[in-house]
Amino acid sequence: MMTQAQTYFYDGSDVALLNGQYTDVFSLLGMHSINEGKALVVRCFLRNAQKVDVISLKDGRKVASLERVNEAGLFAGTLGRRVKPFLYALRVVYPLCELDIIDPYQFGSLLDSQDLYLFGEGSSEQAYRFLGANWRQVDSVEGVHFCVWAPNAKRVSVVGDFNHWDDTRHVMRQHMANGLWEIFLPDVAEGTHYKFDLVYQNGERHAKSDPMATQMECAPHNASIVPKKHQHPWADTQWMHKRATTAWHRAAMSIYEVQLGSWRRKGEFGEQYFDYQDLIEQLIPYVKEQGFTHIELMPVSEYPFDGSWGYQPVGLYAPTHRFGDANGLKAFIDACHQAEIGVLLDWVAAHFPKDPHGLVRFDGTCLYEHEDPRKGTHPDWDTLIYNYDRGEVRSFLLSNACYWLREFHLDGLRLDAVSSMLYLDYSREPGQWLPNAYGGRENLEAIHFLQMLNQRLYQAFPGICMIAEESTAFAGVTKPTDSGGLGFGFKWNMGWMNDSLSYLGRDPIYRQYHHNQLTFSLMYAYSEQFMLSISHDEVVHGKGSLLHKIPGDDWQKFATLKAYYGFMWGHPGKKLLFMGSEFAQRDEWNHNHSLDWHLLAFEPHQGVQRWLRDLNQLYRQFPALSVLDYESQGFRWLDCDNGRDSIFSFVRYGEGSDVPLVFVVNMTPTLHQGFRIGLPQGGDFCEYLNSDSHLYGGSNQGNAGKVIAEDLPWQGMASSALITVPPLGCLILGPATDAPRDTSL
């Protein structure tokens, strides 16, 4: 015979609930009207509870005691003559304690229909505001709203410290139309660990990290963490206003690429990472002193495998625990901005790893990735490729980009491995890939996503920089989207990098036969808005450091590297240099160790560091070195054909009254005296920089800081001069004038 309490459950619903098979729990648990609205019933499921009372949150008074339905923890009861729903808590007596628990099943859905539409359409820019774990206040009750996308799951629960990881305690509300699951939990503290427990259609259970978590545990653990309520108070208003009106393609951009875990370390044996406060105190002043305009951070999204350097992230929204929390990262970026240093972030949207707690087969199906491995797996890295054709996946990625730019005030994103996104046959043999709808090899869905991403980000965040690492000849990477381009602001010049490093590694006696390796880039320099990048990829995996690539004795190595940097800073295009290269690190980069800062005790390394600092200062002072980077009138060869001497000479021009600068770069150890060079005007010329100066550890061959032009036409110029060209050196000359303005932000 059924008890009165048992009649409050539908036929078999109590059994299904206990077995974890009743998915529509909100229709059963919580407060509901019965008897055609003439009474209220409260049902709850609390394992190990001995007694449960209903308490009014308004006045704290007891309203009713619930009856035990069974020993498993089901309780139910009517609330006397009350017929209007009210906010309540459950006073639960356990064997060892008594707790007041605000029942989460009394709250309705907190999802907005417009948010749901945009998320499904693929155009949501703020999906992190309703997905994941977000602090909310509902009817004066504060708590955390949990929400996850898992359309093919049979059941989803949120489990964590707050419910002893019991998957039956907080089963979530399912939205059949869009595949979202949600629940609002008042009794959750910041810093609480949690996961989503999913039951697949085949009955398997899997605990997954929150794809939208903004904080995660240290590896090898992988729980998500409820974020802090307090957010960093920003103080970078002046920077943000100036950034919004800056045309970066005309400004000086000298970027210092940093891997935070190995720039510098602390501890007796260098075993401890710097935290963000350490980086504020040491990295920012260093970058400022060296004259770089920006820091580019290698990925800081949470990643379990140190050896991936962050390029295989599992927590795309969670700053890695290694250096501090989200507020610490925000404080670092804020401090950079106050020091007038921009911050860019490497962002990985091309693929994701197969870690079982991550996105892989998230709800038992290929949700974020393609089902067919010919489109869904990356053969080079054994990772998975996002399904850009799915609206929810596009929203996940678009919202993530917006999250970093909006919440962290980042000044731009550098997209990793764009080439692998653009081509369906990337690193695949015939028969291992599927053509697009037109039979071609282009990944049309990825192309559409990149166009949409760049268009929306540039509209939403004025003054940002979107940068593509793209190594093929794909046309229009930096062309506007309305002209059919991808819409990036800049593209890494991988061709220049490969050619110039190949040239750098040749013995000087043979460089004359490969002269075009340094001149060829000017044949296509204006086809895209290129950025000259010497990144981390060029100093790892047995490639050696830049210094190690160069033949000859130590003097030749250091002299050649300085001359190479001079050529790079004079070449059209923005600049990027990986950390350690600015002082000629001898060993290739090792992510497990700090840079070899002890090398700065030696004069040759000090000389390279001073040279880079002075190059950056000159670069920022003279508009001719940046304002016409992407217009052909900003550059003119004086002599690009002197392969016999391996000497390169050219002029950089600005606009109007901007001072032109003449570069002469000698890539052999031969001293040239009485070497005639054309000059853009008459009068006195200043030898602004000479890489062979004793200030930089050179042999001090040069022109004593001054050159006088003669009225003798040469190399297409009306004037010329006889100069001394130092061995393996770079000269930068310009008309004697007052110091021009700083062209950086």
From Swiss-Prot:
Entry GO CC: cytosol
Please write the reaction equations for the catalytic activity of this protein.
Transfers a segment of a (1->4)-alpha-D-glucan chain to a primary hydroxy group in a similar glucan chain
Query: Which principal EC class is assigned to this enzyme?
Result: transferase
Q: How does it assemble?
A: Monomer.
What biological-process terms (Gene Ontology) are attached?
glycogen biosynthetic process
- Record: active site: 416 (nucleophile), 469 (proton donor)
Identify this protein by name.
1,4-alpha-glucan branching enzyme GlgB
Q: Which InterPro entries match?
A: A-amylase/branching_C (IPR006048), Branching_enzy (IPR037439), GlgB (IPR006407), GlgB_N (IPR054169), GlgB_N_E_set_prok (IPR044143), Glyco_hydro_13_cat_dom (IPR006047), Glyco_hydro_13_N (IPR004193), Glyco_hydro_b (IPR013780)
Superkingdom, according to UniProt? Bacteria
Q: Which UniProt keywords apply?
A: Carbohydrate metabolism, Glycogen biosynthesis, Glycogen metabolism, Glycosyltransferase, Transferase
Its family? Belongs to the glycosyl hydrolase 13 family. GlgB subfamily.
Q: Name one GO molecular function term.
A: hydrolase activity, hydrolyzing O-glycosyl compounds
User: What is its pathway?
Assistant: Glycan biosynthesis; glycogen biosynthesis
